[in-house]
Amino acid sequence: MKNKHRKLSLGFLLTITLLCSITPAALAKTRQNHLIDFLYDNQNTDGTFGIAYQDTAYAIEIINYFNAYSVEVLFEETKSVDIPTFKEFLINQIQTMFNVENIDLYELLYYLDTLNRMESLETSLGSTLHNNIYRYLNETNQIGGGFAPTNTSTTANMVSTFFVYNIYAIIGESVVNQTGHKTWILSCNNTDGGYGGNPSLSSTIVTTYFAVYLFDALGDVNDLVNKTKTLEYFKSFYIDDPDNIGNFGGYLPDFLAYNTLLSSTYYCVKGIELIDESELNGGTTVNWVLNHQNFLDGGFGDWVEGNEQRGSSVSASFYAFKLLETFDSLEVLNEDIFAVEFNYLMLIIILSISGVIIGIIYLFIRRRRI
């Protein structure tokens, strides 16, 4: 009898050990699942996402790509975007801008982009609102080229020019005086090959990408002041040292920085892609991106100084998504991740199964005694 009890006890311990090993794998989720969960964890009560004005558009683009507008989660309420209600919210936000005459071009583009992904602006925007937007954009046009951030400003900058051009494009309108705008963009060129926010400012990765993007959209990147030098400007931020763990494959945000960022890598990669995509290091950069996924929350993030963990954000996750898309590598997000942390769900499952096993053993022993 004692041998039987000993065997049953041993079997029970082996079963528990097996459950502890198998349960994490059984509950493992793909990189994509982790990412979508992270986005919904950052959904606000009004239906928006994240904390920055661009976060909602970024989240909806990812959700739309994976058709994840409704996601069922074990032991939790369904996570979803109420499309009709959210479309109404977005239209109201845009309408309010014009009602109070306080138009923010940066927010406007992201509202329009989000709305357009859920329903074409041709049917959702309405002719009156469309015409108000078009008229306001025309009022930001500068005689010397470029666009100002408001219709009362008389100074163009690269950022507002980029946003105005994209608003024209998303509402289906053409940009007038393209030659004048291209001439103004060229005036922002600097000797390092980059482009500043206006003719008097130093180059930055973002404004240089905007300049290249606009030239590609308005004409041809070959018309840049010096295409080769601009290409070298982007490439100069690349970390090609395999011993530089954590940065190998990424791009620095500036020459004084120590850590590569998802945002700077995105702008450099997209700029290089427009000039000469053969100069990209796809495999290395994709691996670098994947190493930036944080499985504590499922999102992507950059290193935070003084903290061993990455700080995930909706914006950083979007840059990671777009980088993988650029290299046709989004399928890697279907990869199962088995390094799932032990959590309460696993504990409940293991304890429940253990309880059933203990109950069976108890009944078996009791019946044997009878």
Model-derived features: positions:
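Secretory targeting signatures
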Residues: 1-30, 59, 102-105, 115, ...
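Hydrophobic transmembrane signal anchors and adjacent membrane-proximal interface regions, especially
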Residues: 3-8, 12-18, 51, 71-73, ...
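Low-complexity, intrinsically disordered short peptide segments enriched in small/polar/basic residues
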Residues: 13, 19, 70, 80, ...
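An alpha-helical repeat/solenoid feature that recognizes helix-turn-helix modules
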Residues: 17, 48-75, 96-126, 146-178, ...
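Intrinsic disorder/low-complexity segments enriched in polar/small residues
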Residues: 3-8, 44, 120, 174
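Long, well-ordered core segments of solenoidal/helical folds
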Residues: 29-47, 76-101, 125-151, 175-194, ...
